[in-house]
Every structure is written in structure tokens, then in C-alpha cells.
């Protein structure tokens, strides 16, 4: 469709219909100081396409790409290899949208994809059912807390100190406008989790306990005892998974009794992308399905007996009365969910296990080498592909000095917890299949030099 601008006669007719003499009269209520009068200051003149490409290329070169050198950043967003076939397939015109498949008769491909995505997430998390994706991991975590309140009719949520601080921040922001009371704190630099202590703090006002698995420091623990404590007290256990590749090796939260499992799916099929868009994962026990936010795609049979897919549950405020809705999620992360599903399909169960094994093996090798650096130790007694180093000095300046040598050597806890001095010597290091032996050796040598 061509854009045909209004003619002077069109404008005059419209102004006459509303009794205005000029377009400026429409903005009479806007203070003069807030109105734009003339060109925008500092905005360059238009340029040719080639000139714009060169300019944008020059700006892009000021950034450092993840693949330009040794890369050990993690803490919730991980650099994994994404097969070229993933991006190729999601760019097909039939799929290249994140929009809701409102009309099943013309959206069978999208609906089937979401159905398969749900099946994969439920199996990965060890739960009965999963929805068609959320915006990202942090918002999925908050939706789980709200869901627990609806189910238990209680308002206090206990957050593990090992929960990612960004997830805690999102929850605190949202809790300002709800009845939820959040109880949390900063982690301690010690091998074990705080899950045993959490179990002792559950009371009759507790709606849920939220733990991360593996947690922000890379620690892994068995949540079976905590799940039993929650069940005894009538609270729900929410498990947050920020690195789903780990579930190729370690036991799923659902197997250990978690009632709701949420997470971030970025590790599979989705690049780092400057922090987004990502894809939130949400799964739960079947008895809670009607309180689950978002949409649920189901399989059915049409009037002719043919297999088909539909939106089975969609308890969002656009579809039902607002006061009855479980969420207000609109267009969600459908395209990223497709990328996740394609990558999972390409891997298969054996491939995911192999990928997880490679990640863990390289992380063990890195931890061994880095622990040889004088005055450096590995805090964790268990980890998957991420662990915390204890340095003899504040980690944040060390990270900057490593970057000067083109090594992105992890995320300092001083950056994640700027107001907690007790954590400033901690450095969270992630090691995926993209890290080589040469990368590990370079990191260890550079760290030794920086700390000398």
C-alpha cells in the first residue's frame, strides 16, 4: 500500500470540521518550551544509504563481539554455539513473526510449533505441562510468584539469596503494586546454598519459596528436602533455571518436587543479542494449569477427524474479564520460542546430554587451571558450567584489566551487588562449549599477570 499524504484541501476540510483555524492551534495547550520549533539540534542531515552503512559500521566497530577472544561471561546470559540452520529456519515467512495465532485455521504451523515447544520444556523441566513462553526469565519468575499467591491465598514469598539479583529486582519492582511481601538477601561466599535455612523460615503466611538451580554463584543442590518442607507447610516451591543446558546432565527440578519451574531459554537457539529479546520458560504441575499465565496450545481433532492444534487455554485479560485473568501477556516471545525448539530438536536427548557433558568438562578444566593462580581459589564444591572464583582483591578492577588484554574474564559480584562489600572479591566465570583450551590457558596466564 502506498502512503498518500494529505493535500492542503484535505487539511483545510479537517480543520474546518473541528473549528480550528490552523494546525498550530491544535497544540495551543502544549507549553511553548516543550514544542519543537525548527530542526532538531545536533541531528545530522540526511545521507545516502552507503554513507549510513559506513557510519553504522564504524559505530559497530567500537563494540567488542563475543567471538573476538576468550569469553567467560555468564551470570544469566550464555554464549553457546547456535547452528546456522536455526536462524535460517526462523526467517521463513511462515514463521517470521512473534504474533499470537488467533485464527487456528490459518496458523496450524505456528500452533504446532508452540505445542512442540511446550512438550520440550515440560520434559526438560520434569513437569506435567508448560505454556507457550513468556517474555523472559525474570518476568516468568515474577509471574510464578503471583501464581503462587493465587493458589495459596498467601502473600509472603521467600527468595533464596542465590537468586539472580536482576530477577530479585524485577520481583521487587512489581511487588510495589501488589500485595506480595518479598523476603530476600544477598548471598554469602560459601560452598553451600541457603536452602536448609529457607526450609526453617517457612510459616503459615508463606506462599512460595523461590530458588535458582544452579544458583547465581553456580552452586547445585538437591531441592527434595526443601520441596517436602514446602508441601508440609502448604507453600509452593518455585525453581528458576537460567541455564537450561545444565538439565542435560543434572536432575530436573520437577523430579525433585518443584511445583512451578520457570527459566530463561536463551541458551538454546538464541544469541546474546545485547540482552534481548530472550524467551521465558514456564512449567508447572498439571493441577495448577488453570492458574498458569500466558497461553497453552493443545492438540485436538477437527470435524473431519483430522489432527489439529488450537489455543486450549488463554486466560489473559484480552480474552476474558480482566479481574479473572491470570496475566496480561500480549505478543510474547514466539519467534525466540521457535529458535529454542529448533535447536532442541536438532540436538535431541542424546545431543543435549553430550552438549552438557562438554560444558561441564571444560568448566572443570578451567576451574583446575584458574585455581593454580597464586591466591586464587574456587569457592564451589559443585557446579555445572559456571563457578565463582575468590580473588585476593576486588574483582571489578581485575575484569577491566583483563579486558585490556582482550579477555572477557567473567562477571564481578561487585557489579551485581554494588552495595555489598563482602562480595566484591568474587568473580563468576562461565565456560561453555565455545571456550577452547587455548582460551583457558590465556585467561589463567592473564589473571596471574594482573594479580602479580
Curated annotation (Swiss-Prot):
Q: Does the keyword Metal-binding apply?
A: no
EC annotation from Swiss-Prot or TrEMBL: 1.4.4.2
Give yes or no: UniProt keyword Cell membrane.
no
Q: Which GO terms describe its molecular function?
A: glycine dehydrogenase (decarboxylating) activity
Q: Which UniProt keywords apply?
A: Oxidoreductase
Gene3D superfamilies (UniProt xref)? Aspartate Aminotransferase, domain 1, Type I PLP-dependent aspartate aminotransferase-like (Major domain)
What class does this enzyme belong to in the EC scheme?
Answer: oxidoreductase
Task: Name the domain of life this protein comes from.
Answer: Bacteria
**What reaction does this catalyse?**
N(6)-[(R)-lipoyl]-L-lysyl-[glycine-cleavage complex H protein] + glycine + H(+) = N(6)-[(R)-S(8)-aminomethyldihydrolipoyl]-L-lysyl-[glycine-cleavage complex H protein] + CO2
Its assembly, as annotated, is: The glycine cleavage system is composed of four proteins: P, T, L and H. In this organism, the P 'protein' is a heterodimer of two subunits.
PANTHER family (alphabetical) = GLYCINE CLEAVAGE SYSTEM P-PROTEIN, GLYCINE DEHYDROGENASE (DECARBOXYLATING)
Into which family does the record put it? Belongs to the GcvP family. N-terminal subunit subfamily.
What is the protein name stated in its UniProt record? Answer: Probable glycine dehydrogenase (decarboxylating) subunit 1
Recorded source organism is: Sphingopyxis alaskensis (strain DSM 13593 / LMG 18877 / RB2256) (Sphingomonas alaskensis)
Q: What is the lineage of its organism?
A: Bacteria, Pseudomonadati, Pseudomonadota, Alphaproteobacteria, Sphingomonadales
Q: State which gene encodes it.
A: gcvPA
Amino acid at each position: 500500500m502506498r502512503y498518500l499524504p494529505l493535500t492542503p484541501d484535505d487539511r483545510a476540510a479537517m480543520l474546518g470540521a473541528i473549528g480550528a483555524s490552523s494546525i498550530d492551534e491544535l497544540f495551543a495547550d502544549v507549553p511553548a518550551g516543550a514544542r519543537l520549533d525548527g530542526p532538531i539540534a545536533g541531528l545530522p542531515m540526511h545521507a545516502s544509504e552507503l554513507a549510513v552503512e559506513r557510519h553504522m559500521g564504524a559505530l559497530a566497530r567500537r563494540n567488542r563481539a563475543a567471538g573476538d577472544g576468550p569469553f567467560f561471561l555468564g551470570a544469566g546470559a550464555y554464549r553457546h554455539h547456535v547452528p546456522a540452520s536455526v536462524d535460517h529456519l526462523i526467517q521463513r515467512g511462515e514463521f517470521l513473526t512473534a504474533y499470537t495465532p488467533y485464527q487456528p485455521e490459518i496458523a496450524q504451523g505456528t500452533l504446532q510449533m508452540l505445542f512442540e515447544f511446550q512438550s520440550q520444556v515440560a520434559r526438560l523441566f520434569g513437569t506435567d505441562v508448560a505454556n507457550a513462553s513468556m517474555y523472559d526469565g525474570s518476568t516468568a519468575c515474577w509471574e510464578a510468584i503471583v501464581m503462587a499467591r493465587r493458589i495459596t491465598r498467601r502473600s509472603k514469598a521467600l527468595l533464596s539469596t542465590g537468586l539472580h539479583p536482576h530477577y530479585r529486582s524485577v520481583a521487587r519492582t512489581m511487588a510495589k503494586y501488589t500485595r506480595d511481601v518479598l523476603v530476600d538477601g544477598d548471598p554469602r561466599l560459601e560452598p553451600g546454598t541457603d536452602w536448609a535455612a529457607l526450609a526453617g523460615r517457612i510459616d503459615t503466611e508463606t506462599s512460595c519459596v523461590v530458588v535458582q538451580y544452579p544458583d547465581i554463584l553456580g552452586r547445585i543442590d538437591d531441592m527434595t528436602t526443601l520441596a517436602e518442607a514446602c508441601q508440609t507447610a502448604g507453600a509452593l516451591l518455585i525453581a528458576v533455571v537460567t541455564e537450561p543446558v545444565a538439565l542435560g546432565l543434572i536432575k530436573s527440578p520437577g523430579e525433585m518436587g518443584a511445583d512451578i519451574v520457570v527459566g530463561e531459554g536463551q541458551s538454546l537457539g538464541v544469541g546474546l543479542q545485547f540482552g534481548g529479546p530472550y524467551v521465558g520458560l514456564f512449567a508447572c504441575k498439571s493441577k495448577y494449569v488453570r492458574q498458569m499465565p500466558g497461553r497453552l496450545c493443545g492438540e485436538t481433532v477437527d470435524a473431519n477427524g483430522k489432527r489439529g492444534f488450537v489455543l486450549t487455554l488463554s486466560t489473559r485479560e484480552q480474552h476474558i474479564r480482566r479481574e479473572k485473568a491470570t496475566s496480561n501477556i500480549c505478543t510474547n516471545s514466539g519467534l525466540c520460542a521457535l529458535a529454542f525448539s529448533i535447536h532442541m530438536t536438532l540436538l535431541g536427548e542424546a545431543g543435549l546430554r553430550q552438549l552438557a557433558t562438554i560444558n561441564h568438562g571444560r568448566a572443570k578444566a578451567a576451574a583446575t587451571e584458574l585455581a593454580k593462580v597464586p591466591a586464587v581459589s574456587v569457592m564451589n564444591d559443585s557446579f555445572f558450567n559456571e563457578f565463582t572464583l575468590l580473588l585476593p582483591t576486588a574483582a571489578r578492577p581485575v575484569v577491566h584489566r583483563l579486558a585490556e588484554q582482550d579477555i572477557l574474564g567473567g562477571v564481578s559480584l561487585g557489579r551485581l551487588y554494588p552495595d555489598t562489600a563482602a562480595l566484591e572479591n568474587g568473580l563468576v566465570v562461565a565456560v561453555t562449549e565455545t571456550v577452547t583450551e587455548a582460551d583457558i590457558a590465556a585467561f589463567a596466564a592473564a589473571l596471574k599477570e594482573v594479580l602479580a
